[in-house]
């Protein structure tokens, strides 16, 4: 420093004399954001102090300081080097509820002996974190979402608090709201939500917040869609994470496909590339390729030419900055499954790296080392590892990046104060100069106090720290040698997760420029911390100086505690489905561990929103209150940027923090970072209190009542009924299957001897997508604090990889998410039954069972069977099994297609079993298939009504009658569901903005002068402080300025006391007569100031007493005997008209404002107020001036007397309904309108208020100026009151009740403002009219929507494609293979129904049973010059070619594309199952069309019997008419008396109606031999139905008689319209006519028929 001139040096010395003599400096340090209900630390220091220093720390509310939120005491002693700390907690008081969303502050005060140090600190209302875990990431309609909420504080330890939870639909509307407490739950709240069947598809949200901090919302998402889990996953991986634009080779990409159980996929991939520019996507059609996936992978390249040709301006430079995406669709050779995957965000770059300085401080200390933390990323943002970087111009300064992409470069800086420009570049050898990345930054010098050039530099080694290691922190000092001996220690502070973790001192000996602090890293330091250090001294200038630095240090992310899930098995065997397995959980003793196992297929569909430990740390890091990677522009900047406040007794302090968020983007990016068992299973799924309901539901019922009927006898509430019904239905279905399994003993062939019988194969049937939603407490004796728990679990039936996810919560170590533990479950022979999400009733579909043989060298001969289920029409019947024998080569698969027609809606079971010949190997799979009704699902809006009972009701009650929906086009035998939706309509009340704090600066003035002038001076400051307090605007005005303003008010108060007379009244001068108005005004101002400064109540109440006793007349009027000199200060009272009314109103207002303070001291006060009020009320109607109407109106409103005619006068006086104005004086009008606004607020007339406030705001009157005292005071008092009282919404409190005829009681809902947006929903299956009644305030909306299935006009099962398939016998001339029994030609024609040709498309052809395609024909189609197809694929097993896949390069949109090839029949089967052809686009399975084919059946359709839209299967053996005489009487009697036979009739055929598919025979019932369920009378007619294929077998003739009997299961339809089906079990026998009985050949039959009839009628059946 240069020499200082004499006088100014002297001045400096004088100014800082006490400091120069070494007076102590007291300092307080706290985080610059304090959090509610969290333990916070304050560091206290007394530098250069002697002896003990007692310290009291108090925390007050701001600005009022009315409450002590916390108070702590401590003593700083020489033994602790006068350093200490206190911890305090700020309770979540009402004070901190911020309705207007404004920031909240507290005043933190430390009193060191007599010296007070205080600081206003920002408060965060966030009281911890909430983490949400769902059991899956994606769900189907009708399934259940299981979720957990983890409640933790800022230290991530469990807390018990009330949590509000909302579930929102994709439109953002909440459909469920809950309030729950995590008290005694160890921070884990388990919840669930049942997704309705009718639900909006898309991304749903779970949002949660702590009740006391609603503004801090934590959320997670889950997807709802109709899907089927895939069997494999596809990964698209470019060889480089970027595309270098000048790379001639192009972009190389590997497509990997693996089954979920780990085996490699064989198939075909369709790959297309595209360019992404922001939201816009341009696909590159020329890049579309089909590649084989062999042994699980395939390669594809996007050439540079295809890329450049695909864009309009093929300049390479124009593509830089954009990115590439690649989409791959992989289809299995069997065609049974298809999975899509995409990789996007592959940047197009000129350099493969990017350099960032986000981890480098922005400030350097001149002449000291500067640590550059260079963060190098790959273009996708992931950290780049082992990349050399150097500083340009200083080639010696080089470093390699570490695993997190960061390299440390230290450079020496020049001692000058100039900004420093630094350029860093990569030095990767393989890259040319042009390809290296380069970046420049500018660092600014740290500024010292008075240019002292005293510095401190903190430096740490660049390593990835882990808990348990030691970090050496270097403290480097640079300062004036003359003063260095003064630095005996450094104070250091460690900030972590927004709190002061540790504070300490590091001793320094004289002469030490470098001091090292060894810092032990513990788990408390995760995920990162800031170390701040400082020293203080009195410098050469005699001025106290603080010098500081800080450094940000990253710590390896891991759990604070420990949690590992692994296998507890000793031997490493491959787990198989249903097997028991042991899990080993190792974690912190006493922790609660929650588990879930998820099928990996779920993550193939959606891998977002999984809860991981790194996500937890990301949330914590986002909440970091520090804002930079270290250092700062000066000492105060260092503290502020690290998230600390520093305040000292010598005037040093950090700037006021007024925002919770950091000013710029975060300074850091984290690293890329058999029945009984089933019964017990079922019961275990329910909570304890509902288990009894479930157990009872599964008990046998002696009366054989249905489950539904049994629930009517339950009185334990709806939840119990629901569980009972679920468990009852479950066990009924199980019993049914069990019974079926034990009765199906059908004939077997000799072949079956060396093979497991079908009934001995237990099918796999439990395929949950997630399970193991368990809670385990680790109470086992610990070893080194770790408890080990062994858990036995039974694996589910899926063949997949399960991801077992575990989260632990410990009250000592907090939350920990373990790495997922994978369990792969498989067997070497199994069936994968691929079912669609849903199928339509009565629509023929093809499903596929894929058989896998993973045996190394063994070909397997397998018998596979589709089991009969009466809910489907298929080749499997009660009488005949649908079995096939197939051969599967080793390590391959085979697809077996089945054609079925579903006949019943709901969940129906499909079961396939397979057994291997000569091996004891089998598998079975039973899955549920969702069958939906025919027709189109329609949502019909029945009614939308606005509920507003005040406006639309009668005497406050609104009734709405809602009609039933018109369902005339509904599909028969389907249900409808009506949803009644209710929602409140929250109407926001626009509140006018507060006057900006900036505009009030001129009001803070110093009062002076006589008793009147002093009040003129004091008024603006009092009202300004009051206004800023009420509107919470100090942070705008300057938080530190409030104290100064209070000092001015104190000064004004003290000065005013000089003008108080012995009578307690006030005058301009002590000797002057006291003034009524002035005394009342002093009372008014002081009453307001009581909340700001200490005011003696005797001063205030003495003046009140004087006004009542000396100046109030018996009629209540107040009189003025000594008017004020400064008439300009009395505002609108200056006008002499209506003086008595105006003055009385003015004094009365003052008395009422002092009432709370003086009521006890002045006994006459209530009486005085009443008298004055009586006077005003009596004379109010005669008032002429708007001013008097306003001021007297406010005085009366305060008393609750402004009503009726008075109120009417008050309101009608307002001009344009927005101001109370007398011509002439603008200031009087502002004052009068302000009184009127206060009156309106008192009346809570919020409809009238807004225009008045708007008018006042439009006057742009901000106080001040001559004659403005009253206008200033009143306008800000009124506007402050408005900001405080004005509601931000209209009142909403609606009671809505629904009376549904089908329900015995009313359904009621109460809608409040808080829950207005919640969508309340009621469902009913009845389509009925009902009544809605609404009462209360506010508005709501009622919507009624009925969902039903409507008959389709022309049902199109095809989307975007037309398809025609024909099969005909081949001409005799065609040559056929030797072993072929028959040859036919299959012709397929297709066309795309789009605007242009379809690109690559696929024909998926399943062959008819026993048929295979001619491979020579296929080769010719693929390899001929006229290539019709691009490629074909057949199942590898030669003799059982079940599926053929043909790839087409394109499908024309303008004409039919046709191809034909021969198919040969190699073996005969009794019944040929139809084949299917499906055409679809490679990128979208929805764009498809399916057709069936069969040699004998039109369209390849299975026969089914439909009548009045009811269908059943008829693909069974036709009945054969009993016509020969071999049938004996006994046989007839035995057969007619078999169980199940319902009726026996003698009938006469009246009429035959033939049709295309089914024939109807109208029979007259001549005699009822055995009556059945149909109460038919003799002579009545009944319809018997038979499929046309049985016409020949039946040969029925009109007018002939027949003996008929049949089963009840052959009835069709409902009474009284019952029809009878002639099925395989129906007996039809010609009954000869009387004349025919004379013939000898018929005599025996006629006698037997007579005897049969007599026996049946007289004796009936023996059983």
Swiss-Prot record:
<dbReference type="GO" id="GO:0001970">
    <property type="term" value="P:positive regulation of activation of membrane attack complex"/>
</dbReference>
<dbReference type="InterPro" id="IPR035815">
    <property type="entry name" value="NTR_complement_C3"/>
</dbReference>
<feature type="disulfide bond" description="Interchain (with C-816)">
    <location>
        <begin position="559"/>
        <end position="816"/>
    </location>
</feature>
<keyword id="KW-0276">Fatty acid metabolism</keyword>
<dbReference type="InterPro" id="IPR040839">
    <property type="entry name" value="MG4"/>
</dbReference>
<dbReference type="GO" id="GO:0005102">
    <property type="term" value="F:signaling receptor binding"/>
</dbReference>
<feature type="glycosylation site" description="N-linked (GlcNAc...) asparagine">
    <location>
        <position position="939"/>
    </location>
</feature>
<dbReference type="GO" id="GO:0042113">
    <property type="term" value="P:B cell activation"/>
</dbReference>
<dbReference type="InterPro" id="IPR041555">
    <property type="entry name" value="MG3"/>
</dbReference>
<keyword id="KW-0443">Lipid metabolism</keyword>
<feature type="disulfide bond">
    <location>
        <begin position="694"/>
        <end position="727"/>
    </location>
</feature>
<dbReference type="GO" id="GO:0010866">
    <property type="term" value="P:regulation of triglyceride biosynthetic process"/>
</dbReference>
<feature type="site" description="(Microbial infection) Cleavage; by S.pyogenes SpeB">
    <location>
        <begin position="541"/>
        <end position="542"/>
    </location>
</feature>
<feature type="site" description="Cleavage; by carboxypeptidases">
    <location>
        <begin position="747"/>
        <end position="748"/>
    </location>
</feature>
<feature type="disulfide bond">
    <location>
        <begin position="1358"/>
        <end position="1489"/>
    </location>
</feature>
<dbReference type="Pfam" id="PF07678">
    <property type="entry name" value="TED_complement"/>
</dbReference>
<feature type="cross-link" description="Isoglutamyl cysteine thioester (Cys-Gln)">
    <location>
        <begin position="1010"/>
        <end position="1013"/>
    </location>
</feature>
<keyword id="KW-1068">Hemolytic uremic syndrome</keyword>
<feature type="disulfide bond">
    <location>
        <begin position="1101"/>
        <end position="1158"/>
    </location>
</feature>
<feature type="modified residue" description="Phosphoserine; by FAM20C">
    <location>
        <position position="1573"/>
    </location>
</feature>
<feature type="domain" description="Anaphylatoxin-like">
    <location>
        <begin position="693"/>
        <end position="728"/>
    </location>
</feature>
<feature type="site" description="Coordinates Mg(2+) for interaction with Complement factor B Bb fragment (CFB)">
    <location>
        <position position="1663"/>
    </location>
</feature>
<dbReference type="GO" id="GO:0035578">
    <property type="term" value="C:azurophil granule lumen"/>
</dbReference>
<dbReference type="InterPro" id="IPR011626">
    <property type="entry name" value="Alpha-macroglobulin_TED"/>
</dbReference>
<dbReference type="InterPro" id="IPR009048">
    <property type="entry name" value="A-macroglobulin_rcpt-bd"/>
</dbReference>
<keyword id="KW-0913">Age-related macular degeneration</keyword>
<dbReference type="GO" id="GO:0150064">
    <property type="term" value="P:vertebrate eye-specific patterning"/>
</dbReference>
<keyword id="KW-0225">Disease variant</keyword>
<dbReference type="GO" id="GO:0150062">
    <property type="term" value="P:complement-mediated synapse pruning"/>
</dbReference>
<feature type="site" description="(Microbial infection) Cleavage; by N.meningitidis NalP">
    <location>
        <begin position="744"/>
        <end position="745"/>
    </location>
</feature>
<dbReference type="InterPro" id="IPR000020">
    <property type="entry name" value="Anaphylatoxin/fibulin"/>
</dbReference>
<dbReference type="Pfam" id="PF00207">
    <property type="entry name" value="A2M"/>
</dbReference>
<comment type="subunit">
    <text>(Microbial infection) C3b interacts with herpes simplex virus 1 (HHV-1) and herpes simplex virus 2 (HHV-2) envelope glycoprotein C; this interaction inhibits the activation of the complement system.</text>
</comment>
<keyword id="KW-0964">Secreted</keyword>
<dbReference type="InterPro" id="IPR018933">
    <property type="entry name" value="Netrin_module_non-TIMP"/>
</dbReference>
<feature type="modified residue" description="Phosphoserine; by FAM20C">
    <location>
        <position position="38"/>
    </location>
</feature>
<dbReference type="Pfam" id="PF01759">
    <property type="entry name" value="NTR"/>
</dbReference>
<keyword id="KW-1015">Disulfide bond</keyword>
<feature type="disulfide bond">
    <location>
        <begin position="1537"/>
        <end position="1661"/>
    </location>
</feature>
<keyword id="KW-0399">Innate immunity</keyword>
<dbReference type="GO" id="GO:0034774">
    <property type="term" value="C:secretory granule lumen"/>
</dbReference>
<dbReference type="InterPro" id="IPR001840">
    <property type="entry name" value="Anaphylatoxn_comp_syst_dom"/>
</dbReference>
């Amino acid at each position: 420093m240069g020499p200082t001139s004499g006088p100014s040096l002297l001045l400096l010395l004088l100014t800082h004399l006490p400091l120069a003599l070494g007076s102590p400096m007291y300092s307080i340090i706290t985080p610059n954001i304090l959090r509610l209900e969290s333990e916070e630390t304050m560091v206290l220091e007394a530098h250069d102090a002697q002896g003990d220093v007692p310290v009291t720390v108090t925390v007050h509310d701001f600005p009022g300081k009315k409450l002590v939120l916390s108070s702590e005491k401590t003593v700083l002693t020489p033994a602790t080097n006068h350093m200490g700390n206190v911890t305090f907690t700020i309770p979540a008081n009402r004070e901190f509820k911020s309705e207007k969303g404004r920031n909240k502050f507290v005043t933190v005060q430390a009193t060191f002996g007599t010296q007070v140090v205080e600081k206003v600190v920002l408060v965060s209302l966030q009281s911890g974190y909430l983490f949400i875990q769902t059991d899956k990431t994606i769900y189907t309609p009708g399934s259940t979402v299981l979720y957990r909420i983890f409640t933790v504080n800022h230290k991530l330890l469990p807390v018990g608090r009330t949590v509000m939870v909302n579930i929102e639909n994709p439109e953002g509307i909440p459909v469920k709201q809950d309030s729950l407490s995590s008290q005694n739950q160890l921070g884990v709240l388990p919840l669930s939500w049942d997704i309705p069947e009718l639900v909006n598809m898309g991304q749903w949200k779970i949002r949660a917040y702590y009740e006391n901090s609603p503004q801090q919302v934590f959320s997670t998402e889950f997807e709802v869609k109709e899907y089927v889990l895939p069997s494999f996953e596809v990964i698209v991986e470019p060889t480089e994470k970027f595309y270098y634009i000048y790379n001639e080779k192009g972009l190389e990409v590997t497509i990997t496909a693996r089954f979920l159980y780990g085996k490699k996929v064989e198939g075909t991939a369709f790959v297309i590339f595209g360019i992404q520019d922001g939201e816009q996507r341009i696909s590159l059609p020329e890049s579309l390729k089909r590649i084989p996936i062999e042994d699980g992978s395939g390669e594809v390249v996007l050439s540079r030419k295809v890329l450049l040709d695909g864009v309009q301006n093929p300049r390479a430079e124009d593509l830089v900055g954009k990115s590439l995406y690649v989409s791959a669709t992989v289809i299995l050779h069997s065609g049974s499954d298809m999975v899509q995957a995409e990789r996007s965000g592959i940047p197009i770059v000129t350099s493969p790296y990017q350099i960032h300085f986000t981890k480098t401080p922005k400030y350097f200390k001149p002449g000291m080392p500067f640590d550059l933390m260079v963060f190098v990323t790959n273009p996708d943002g992931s950290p780049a590892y082992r990349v050399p970087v150097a500083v340009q111009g200083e080639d010696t300064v080089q470093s390699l990046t570490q695993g997190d992409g960061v390299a440390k470069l230290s450079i020496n800086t020049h001692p000058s104060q100039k900004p420093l420009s630094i350029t860093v570049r990569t030095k990767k050898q393989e890259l040319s100069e042009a390809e290296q990345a380069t970046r420049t930054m500018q660092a600014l010098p740290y500024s010292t106090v008075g240019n002292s050039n005293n510095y401190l530099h903190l430096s740490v080694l660049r390593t990835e720290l882990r808990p348990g290691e030691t970090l050496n922190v270097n403290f480097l000092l640079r300062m004036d040698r003359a003063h260095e001996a003064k630095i005996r220690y450094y104070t250091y502070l460690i900030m972590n997760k927004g709190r002061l973790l540790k504070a300490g001192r590091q001793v320094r000996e004289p002469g030490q420029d470098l001091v090292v602090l060894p810092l032990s890293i513990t788990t408390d330091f995760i995920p990162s911390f800031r170390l701040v250090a400082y020293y203080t001294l009195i410098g050469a200038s005699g001025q106290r100086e603080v010098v500081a630095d800080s450094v940000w240090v990253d710590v390896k992310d891991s759990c604070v505690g420990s949690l590992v899930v692994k296998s507890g098995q000793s031997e490493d065997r491959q787990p198989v489905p249903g097997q028991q397995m042991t899990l080993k959980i190792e974690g912190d003793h006493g922790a609660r561990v929650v588990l879930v196992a998820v099928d990996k297929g779920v993550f193939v569909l959606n891998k977002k929103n999984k809860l991981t430990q790194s996500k937890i740390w990301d949330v914590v890091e986002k909440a970091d209150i520090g804002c930079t990677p270290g250092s700062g522009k000066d000492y105060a900047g260092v503290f502020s940027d690290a998230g600390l406040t520093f305040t000292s007794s010598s005037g040093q302090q950090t700037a006021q923090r007024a925002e919770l968020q950091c000013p710029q983007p975060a300074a850091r990016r984290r690293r890329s970072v058999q029945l009984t068992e089933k019964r017990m299973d079922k019961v275990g799924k329910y909570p304890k209190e509902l288990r009894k309901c479930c157990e009872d539901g599964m008990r046998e019922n002696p009366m054989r009542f249905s489950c539904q009927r049994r629930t009517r006898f339950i009185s334990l509430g709806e939840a119990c009924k629901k569980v009972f019904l679920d468990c009852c239905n479950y066990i009924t279905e199980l019993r049914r299957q069990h019974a079926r399994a034990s009765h199906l003993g059908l004939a077997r062939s000799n072949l079956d001897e060396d093979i497991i019988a079908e009934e001995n194969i237990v099918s796999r049937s439990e395929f949950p997508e997630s399970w193991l939603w368990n809670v385990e407490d680790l109470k086992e004796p610990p070893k080194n604090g770790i408890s080990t728990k062994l858990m036995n679990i039974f694996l589910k039936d899926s063949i997949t990889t399960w991801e077992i996810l575990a989260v632990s919560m410990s009250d000592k170590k907090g939350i920990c998410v373990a790495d997922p533990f994978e369990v792969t479950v498989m067997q070497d022979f199994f069936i994968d039954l691929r079912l669609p999400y849903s199928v339509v009733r009565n629509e023929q579909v093809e499903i596929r069972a894929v058989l896998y043989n993973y045996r190394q060298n063994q070909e397997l001969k397998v018998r596979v069977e589709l089991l009969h289920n009466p809910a489907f029409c298929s080749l499997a019947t009660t009488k005949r099994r649908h079995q096939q024998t197939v051969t599967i080569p080793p390590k391959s698969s085979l697809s077996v297609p089945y054609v079925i027609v579903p006949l019943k809606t709901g969940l129906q079971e499909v079961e396939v079993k397979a057994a291997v010949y000569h091996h004891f190997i089998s598998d079975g799979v039973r899955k549920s298939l969702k069958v939906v009704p025919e027709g189109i699902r329609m949502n019909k809006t029945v009614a939308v009504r606005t509920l507003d009972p005040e406006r639309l009701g009668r005497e406050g009650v609104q009734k709405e009658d809602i009609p039933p929906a018109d369902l005339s086009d509904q599909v028969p035998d389907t249900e409808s569901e009506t949803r009644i939706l209710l929602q409140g309509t929250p109407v926001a009340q626009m509140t006018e903005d507060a006057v900006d704090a900036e505009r009030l600066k001129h009001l803070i003035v110093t009062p002076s002068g006589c008793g009147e002038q002093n009040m003129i001076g004091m008024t603006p400051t009092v009202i300004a402080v009051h206004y800023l307090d009420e509107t919470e605007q100090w942070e705008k005005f300057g938080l530190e300025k409030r104290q100064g303003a209070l000092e001015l008010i104190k000064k004004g108060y003290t000065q005013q006391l000089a003008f108080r007379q012995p009578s307690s009244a006030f005058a301009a001068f002590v000797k002057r007569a006291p003034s009524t108005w002035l005394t009342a005004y002093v009372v008014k101002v002081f009453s307001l100031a009581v909340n700001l400064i200490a005011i003696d109540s005797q001063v205030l109440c003495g003046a009140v007493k004087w006004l009542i006793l000396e100046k109030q007349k018996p009629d209540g009027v107040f009189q003025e005997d000594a008017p004020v000199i400064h008439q300009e200060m009395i505002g609108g009272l200056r006008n002499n008209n209506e003086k008595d009314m105006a003055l009385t109103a003015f004094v009365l207002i003052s008395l009422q404002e002092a009432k709370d303070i003086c009521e006890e001291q002045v006994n006459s006060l209530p009486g005085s107020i009443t008298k004055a009020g009586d006077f005003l009320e009596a004379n109010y109607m005669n008032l002429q001036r708007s001013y008097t109407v306003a001021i007297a109106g406010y005085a009366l409103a305060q008393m609750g007397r402004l009503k009726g005619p008075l109120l009417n006068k008050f309101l009608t006086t307002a001009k344009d309904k927005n101001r109370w104005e007398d011509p002439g004086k603008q200031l009087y009008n502002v004052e009068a309108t302000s009184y009127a606004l206060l009156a309106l607020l008192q009346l809570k007339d919020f409809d009238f208020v807004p225009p008045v406030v708007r008018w006042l705001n439009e006057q742009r009157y901000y106080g001040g100026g001559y004659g403005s005292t009253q206008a200033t005071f009143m306008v800000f008092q009124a506007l402050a009151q408005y900001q405080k009282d004005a509601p931000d919404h209209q009142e909403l409190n609606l009671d809505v009740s629904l009376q549904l005829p089908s329900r015995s009681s009313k359904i009621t809902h109460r809608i409040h403002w808080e829950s207005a947006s919640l969508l309340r929903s009621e469902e009913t299956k009845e389509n009925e009219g009902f009544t809605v009644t609404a009462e209360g305030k506010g508005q709501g909306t009622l919507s009624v929507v009925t969902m039903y299935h409507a008959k389709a006009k022309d049902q199109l099962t095809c989307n975007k494609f037309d398809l025609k398939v024909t099969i005909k016998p081949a001409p005799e001339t065609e040559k056929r293979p030797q072993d072929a029994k028959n040859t036919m030609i299959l012709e397929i024609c297709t066309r795309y129904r789009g605007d242009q040709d379809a690109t690559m498309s696929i024909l998926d052809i399943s062959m008819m049973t026993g048929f295979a395609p001619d491979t020579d024909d296929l080769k010719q189609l693929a390899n001929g010059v006229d290539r019709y197809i691009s490629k074909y694929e057949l199942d590898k097993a030669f003799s059982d070619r079940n599926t053929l896949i043909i790839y087409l390069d394109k499908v024309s949109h303008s004409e039919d594309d046709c191809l034909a090839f021969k198919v040969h029949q190699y073996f005969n089967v009794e019944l040929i199952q139809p084949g299917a052809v499906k055409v679809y686009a490679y990128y979208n399975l929805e764009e498809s069309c399916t057709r069936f084919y069969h040699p004998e059946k039109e369209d390849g359709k299975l026969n089914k019997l439909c009548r009045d839209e009811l269908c059943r299967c008829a693909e069974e053996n036709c009945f054969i008419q009993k016509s020969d005489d071999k049938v004996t009487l006994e046989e007839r009697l035995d057969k007619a008396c078999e169980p199940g036979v319902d009726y026996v009739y003698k009938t006469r055929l009246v009429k035959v109606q033939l049709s295309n598919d089914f024939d109807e025979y109208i029979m007259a019932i001549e005699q009822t031999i055995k009556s059945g369920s149909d109460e038919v009378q003799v002579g009545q007619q009944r319809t018997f139905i038979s499929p046309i294929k049985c016409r020949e077998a039946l040969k029925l003739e009109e007018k002939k008689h027949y003996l008929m009997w049949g089963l009840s299961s052959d009835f069709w339809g409902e009474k009284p319209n019952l029809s009878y089906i002639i099925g395989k079990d129906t007996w039809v026998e010609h009954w000869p006519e009387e004349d025919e009985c004379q013939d000898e050949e018929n005599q025996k039959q006629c006698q037997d028929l007579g005897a049969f009839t007599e026996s049946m009628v007289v004796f009936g059946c023996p059983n």
